[in-house]
């Protein structure tokens, strides 16, 4: 397996909490990413949404688009509705030769609400889960046919958060549903990244390697933050 190293712009600014790094320019982000030796970077809120603007900007700093976040509402939308909504980002990623799209379900998510307790995140019962697995499989097959693999991102505060959620998703969906393994989110959810890696290596196409401060993790779990 060939591994290429990229970085995400959240290291400079946070799209969910714009007050964190909101005054950091896109140019500073790209320049420092390149200086650090990365060859790729994920898209972010400050990035141009048109390829004729984004490609020259990335080229200026010798960077490639290595993926980027797409927040879906596939639980509530039909597959056709979600296909229509994804078109602008799909075109951008295809134009930029991105190897995949990081895809996460955000319907009902609490990730952007600091007043919600972690335990109140949305969850699906068996009936809804079955319908969702069918829809995400159809969506993934569509994106695969478009040459843009869907790399599902388990994420805190969403319906696919824990190791158990992630395993069920992968075991009950088409092989075209690939995986973004995020070590920080998996640790926060008290799961085992290495087990996921070993059990589903054939589905893993993208990875987020993160650290978590132990004291902050323990406080968050204890106080349900």
Where are these regions (language model features)?
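Non-cysteine beta-strand/loop elements that form the S-adenosyl-L-methionine
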Residues: 4-9, 66, 100-106, 201-214
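Active-site beta-loop-alpha junctions enriched in small/polar residues
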Residues: 10-12, 44-46, 70-75, 106-108, ...
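Short, well-ordered alpha-helical microsegments
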Residues: 50-52, 166, 190
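Gly/Pro-rich active-site loop or hairpin
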Residues: 18-23, 79, 115, 163, ...
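Active-site acidic/histidine proton-transfer and metal-coordination neighborhood
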Residues: 80-181, 188
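N-terminal pre-domain/capping segments
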Residues: 1-100, 138, 145, 175-178
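Glycine/Thr-rich phosphate-binding loops of Rossmann-like dinucleotide-binding domains
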Residues: 51, 111, 217
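Short, hinge-like loop/turn segments at secondary-structure boundaries
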Residues: 59-61, 84-85, 119-120, 168-170, ...
């Amino acid at each position: 397996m060939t591994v290429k190293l990229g970085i995400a712009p959240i290291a400079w600014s946070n799209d969910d909490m714009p007050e964190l790094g909101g005054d950091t320019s896109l140019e500073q982000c790209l320049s420092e990413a390149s200086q650090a030796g990365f060859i790729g970077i994920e898209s972010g809120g400050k990035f141009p949404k048109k390829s004729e603007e984004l490609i020259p900007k990335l080229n200026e700093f010798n960077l490639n688009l290595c993926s980027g976040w797409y927040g879906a509402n596939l639980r509530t939308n039909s597959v056709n509705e979600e296909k229509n909504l994804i078109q602008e980002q799909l075109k951008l990623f295809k134009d930029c030769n991105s190897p995949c799209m990081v895809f996460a379900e955000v319907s009902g998510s609490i990730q952007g609400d600091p007043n919600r307790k972690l335990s109140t995140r949305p969850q699906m019962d068996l009936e809804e889960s079955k319908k969702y697995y069918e829809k995400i499989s159809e969506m993934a097959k569509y994106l695969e046919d478009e040459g843009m693999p869907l790399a599902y991102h388990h994420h805190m505060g969403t319906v696919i958060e824990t190791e158990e959620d992630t395993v069920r998703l992968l075991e009950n969906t088409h092989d075209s549903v690939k995986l973004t393994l995020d070590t920080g989110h998996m640790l926060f959810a008290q799961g085992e990244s290495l087990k996921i890696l070993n059990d589903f290596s054939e589905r893993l196409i993208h990875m987020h390697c993160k650290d978590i401060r132990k004291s902050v993790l323990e406080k968050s779990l204890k106080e349900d933050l």
